Amino acid sequence: MNAKIKLENHDAQEIKYTTCYMCACRCGIKVTLEDNKVRFIQGNRNHPTNQGVLCAKGSAGIMKQYSTAKLTQPLMRKPGTERGEGIYEPISWEQALDVLTERLEEIRATDPSKLGFFTGRDQMQALTGLWAQQFGTPNWSAHGGFCSVNMAAAGLYSIGFSFWEFGAPDWDYAKYFLMWGVAEDHSSNPIKIGLEKLKRRGGKFVTVNPVRTGYSAIADEWLPIKPGMDGLLAMSMVHVLLKHEKFDYEFLVRYTNASWLVVQAPGQKGDGLFLRDENDHPLIWDIEKEAFRNGIDGDIAPALFGEYVAPDGRRVKTVMSMMVERYLDERYAPENVALECGLPAEAIERIALEMAHVAFKETVELPIEWTDVWGRKHDKVVGRPVAMYAMRGIAAHSNGFHSCRAIHMIQMLLGALDAPGNFRARAPYPKPIPPHQLPENNIDIINAPNTPLSRPPLGFPTRPEDLVIDEFGNPLRIDKAYSWEVPIASHGLMHMVITNATNHDPYALDTLILFMANMAWNSSMNTANIQDMLRAKDMENFGEYKIPFLVVIDAFHSEMTNFADLILPDTTYLERHDSISLLDRPISEPDAAADAIRYPLVKPDRNVRPWQEVMVELAGRLKFPAFTKPDGTPKFSGYQDFIVNYERSPGIGFLAGWRGKDGTKSLKGEPNPNQWEKYIENQSFFAHHWPDNQKYMRFANKDYLDVASDAGFVGKVEPIIMQFYSEPLQKFRLAGQGLYDGPQPNNQVDRERLVKYFDPLPMWYEPLEQQRVDKDEYPFFALTQRPMFMYHSWDSQNVWLRQIMAQNYMYMNARKAVEMGIKDFDWIWVESHNGKIRCQVKTMEGTQEDTIWTWNAIGKQKGAWGLKEDASEATKGFLLNHLISELLPEKAGERRVTNSDPVTGQAAWFDLRVKIWKAAPGETGSWPQFDALKKLPGDEYERPNVLRYDARSHEKN
């Protein structure tokens, strides 16, 4: 009882500010250090993202820094050992880079496509994409294809911005908030802050989700929808709005293509395309001039409804007329979709009308003068205060692209976009629809040795000519992105890389580089088979591995590292420089363009290097033109120098703050040699706050677009007209019908998919996998969610966060469990068409009765992530991934195709259907189980049963 309390010695402490990396929010953090140790982490009250709020993940960043899973040195697979055995020899960084440089030099000088470079949740895609482009390989993407590309693509092909990084609810003025399929890890602190504001003002919060946890637990109303039915629900709401004539006429005719005229010529070329003038402008019918006029002009009076005969004799119809014909069909009436959605018809109609009431009867008006892009002066901004947000619950279905477009259709009808109280854009968005960036598809450039690509590997196709295919229609990318199978795969298909590379379909790789991507475990579908593929050998090629050389870059000992031939150890986020750039996935908020940095707060105690630095060095070694001087010597001394001095175009660099030689310019300006120091002085972030006249209606706000054009966010200063009807989709449909003057698919499967799924108006169809499985045999939907306190496999190694959860359960509806004789903590079998697992069950009321679900990535392979072999994560935790195939179930007469959205290639994680039954007595423990991973050389960490951490005395035991 005489023990003295050890008080803080503030004189020995130092406070530094940086950016969190415990999830994708990128919150600002205040880090207290003592003797090169992290004492504690707090939120930065001045930061635009989190305003001082910090979640469990962010606070537990200390235990990421002191994780026992950290890699310690470069490692090479020992000669004579098999891939996956985990037997390695330490090598020096110089040796490692020499080995990699020699291999990459040979690939680049012969066939650059033989390199695949794919990255996980790295938040530095502007650099990794540039690196791949300079190497000359089309085979690059980040993780978006298995994350939420459906959200991004649907938004960027519809409204010019999107859910996630490119837009946010206006929490300050919203009066009604509808959340679609958002797990509680997503945009964690900003949403928490926003919901508190909404609740304090008495706004209504409605959630659409099969599961009621996290954010949904505090919703005023929960709609427990059946998975994959969200688009049908949205279209039923559209039906209600149109039936009751609840739409914003002025918004539709000024800012959308609702009045544009569409050619009606079924079976003929040009059917479904916009009627255009000789300058390619879309035409409308002007009801005052009684003439066809340019639909982009400002002084027009467009007809919103109507059918006309064009000067060339073709019949044309307004987009709005086509929408009314489709969505007023009784197919979409609430009473006719209620059973499919699992929701009361009354609730569907009521919520649609509630939104309309708030939009049109509780309008927000702000006395702000602004000028539109046509030169008209406005003395106020009018906001329809209905905000929405959507994420993976919509995206992770093979119908998610159209479902998200349907949600945007509601927003457009209500006029509830980029104005007070609704869903607002975040810089550098909005952009032209779609953005004017096309993927590299010139086969001569792709095949050229030692030659950078002329365009980025990723982009936004608008027609079949933009596909990345050869003259015979074969894919030029290893993941088949931008092929006839998935034409608008704007983020690639990382989940298909290992399968395609193993099958040499469409060709073989020589080297695959994976950065921070746990593709041997929770980031892949069909996990056990993927591990087998990584070990697979080509017996026709002297037993060479089918993927000959595999490089893994990670800071931690994940399940993936043991399959590497070469392991390059990365630093933690507190040990390196980073830029969170406006060229990439910035931290902007609706009222400010913002970016941020990280810089080393503590010195690594291991032989590790930041992958950013390694990429810059490799770029110099390989003599990439953007990274070398005319004499072939490196242009940049390292990553910091690169970030300061690289310019995508004159004055446009990775960081937007403190540009210009004297640091006085924002967004655009010459390189500033003191730029890093200025960011550090400003607590590691920069924010350019928009003046009031540039905050709203930015798709048509001349004052904003002038600045955006100068900053490189957009090209010309012209209106960004929102698209109910997507002409790019119709061009692909025409190609499938054989009616397109340009490339057309020669495979019947591809033709049928284009005709069926490339509808220019949002459509709903049953998820693809569910079309091919017996629903009576597999009666349950099965999902995963990310918990609020963990972010994928990053954090279930974290000793503080593990105390919250070290075992995931399969959750099911309590009433359904009683019917089946299942009770809490029973062991059950769960089986899909692809495989089966054994796991432990818990029951809950807040789950749609036909749905079972679990937390994502809690389950671990024994020996991974610095955990003991008997850790609960390995013995009781489990993955749902084993049940999910990366390919659709076989269909007679059809090649196997990806289990993804047919438009975007989004991985269809949530299309899964399963059956369940109680395990027999004695059947306990999670299944399947895998051999334990071996400790890696240099892993001398203790794994205590009880942890005490105190930076003041360096206690950790």
What are these regions (language model features)?
Residues 1-25:
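Short, Gly/Pro- and small/polar-rich lid/capping loops
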Residues 216-217, 221-375, 381:
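Long, well-ordered, tryptophan-enriched scaffold segments
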Residues 574-604, 614, 889-892:
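Glycine/threonine-rich phosphate-binding loop and adjacent beta-strand/alpha-helix elements that clamp
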Residues 128-207, 232, 408-563, 572, ...:
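Extended redox/cofactor-interaction regions of prokaryotic respiratory oxidoreductases
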Residues 96-115, 167-175, 326-329, 349-387, ...:
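Glycine-rich phosphate/diphosphate-binding loops that line cofactor/substrate pockets in enzymes
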Residues 600-601, 611-670, 795-811, 815-957:
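Long, contiguous, secondary-structure-rich segments that constitute the structural scaffold
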Residues 319-324, 330, 335-490:
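Active-site phosphate/pyrophosphate-binding segments
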Residues 17-29, 51-61:
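Local cysteine-cluster metal-coordination motifs and their immediate loop/turn environment
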